[in-house]
Amino acid sequence: MKRTYQPNRRKRSKVHGFRARMSTRNGRKVLARRRRKGRKVLSA
């Protein structure tokens, strides 16, 4: 059985990246939440 995590930089940024977050309203909410919490890294 193969492992579930198969790293792929392009897919990672497409799904969890900053521009992906900014492209939807809920994604912007995620970023706002993380800013409010004081996260050093906002997105992948």
Swiss-Prot record:
Annotated Gene Ontology cellular component terms: ribonucleoprotein complex; ribosome
Top-level lineage group: Bacteria
Family matches, as InterPro entries: Ribosomal_bL34, Ribosomal_bL34_CS
Keywords: Ribonucleoprotein, Ribosomal protein
GO biological process, one term: translation
Basic residues bias: start-end ranges: 1-19, 26-44
Region (Disordered): 1-44
Record's keyword annotation contains RNA-binding: no
GO terms of molecular function: structural constituent of ribosome
Family the UniProt entry places it in: Belongs to the bacterial ribosomal protein bL34 family.
The protein's name in its UniProt record: Large ribosomal subunit protein bL34
Organism: Geobacillus kaustophilus (strain HTA426)
